Amino acid sequence: MPVSISETDIENYAKDGALLIKNLFTPDEVSDLREGIDANISHPSSRAKVASNESDPGWFFEDFCNWQENSAFQRIIFESDISEVAAKLMCSEQVRLFHDHMLVKKTGTKQRTPWHQDQPYYNIEGMQNISFWIPVDPVPLEWTLEFIAGSHQENWYLPRTFLKKEAKWFPEGSLSDTPNIDENPEKYRVLSWELEPGDAVAFHMLTLHAGAGSGALRRVFSVRLIGDDIRHAPRDWETSPEFPGLSDQLPAGVPMDHELFPVIWPASRA
C-alpha cells in the first residue's frame, strides 16, 4: 500500500524543510537497493570520491549519477512511491530526477559531514526541490543526520570542500559563511530522527544539515528530485556533481528538459 502523505506532512515540509517518512520502502525494495549499493561500492564510477582522511579508522565514500548503469537504483527511482511523495511534498505537477548520490560510512568512521546546504553545490535555481536520504542499515540518533528547521527559507551559504574547507564553487566572500551551529546550538531548532531500513528523510536542498561519523556500517542512497519551478543555472566552475557539456545544450534559465533529468511523475508505468 502506498505511503500516506497528509496535509500536515506537506505543511511541515514547507515550514521545516525536513520530514521523516516511515516505511516509504518495502522490505523487498530495501533488499534490492542494498544489493545495488554494494554493487556500486565494488564497481565505483569515475565520479566516486573518498571524503575521509587517510588517518581515519573508517571510510567515508560517495559516488554520483549511477542510475543509468545500476538497475537497483533505477527501480527505486522509477518504480517506488518516491516520485508521488515528492510531487505532494513539493506541491509540483511534475517531478524530474536531478541525480542520485550514494554515501557510505564504514564502521569507525570519524569524519563528520559538516553543516552545509546542497543547492549551492549544484547548477540549478528554484525552490521546488527535494532530496530523499534512504539508509539500508539502521541509523541510531547518534549517527543520523541533523537539520536546522526552517533554514531553507534563509540565506544561501558558501559551499566548501568537506576536508580542506576550500571555496571551490562560489568565490570566497560572495556568499555568507555557514553559521557556527555547534558552538551556538541554543539558537537553532535541530531536527533528527532514528531510522530503520525502509524509512527515509525528505529535505529541501537549501536546508542546513550535518552528520556525525558512524560506529557501524551506514549505507545510504540519496535521490535528488526537482519540480516545476527549477531552472538551469550554469556555473563558471565545476559543480558537484558535474554535468560536462550540459551548458552547451541547455541554456541558462530554462527548465531541466534533458535526457539526464527524466520525468518520473506523472509516472508511465505499464
Walk through the language-model features, giving the residues of each.
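Generic beta-strand structural signal
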Residues: E93-V95, H99-D100, Q111-T113, Q128-I134, ...
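Short, charged/polar surface micro-motifs in flexible loops or helix N-caps
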Residues: I82, T107-K110, D137-L141, Q153, ...
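Histidine-centered catalytic micro-motifs
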Residues: R112-P120, F147, M205-A212, V223
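Non-heme Fe(II)-dependent double-stranded beta-helix
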Residues: M1-D16, I21-W115, Y121-Y122, D236-E238
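Short, conserved beta-strand element in jelly-roll/cupin
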Residues: N123-P140, E194, A202, R224-G227
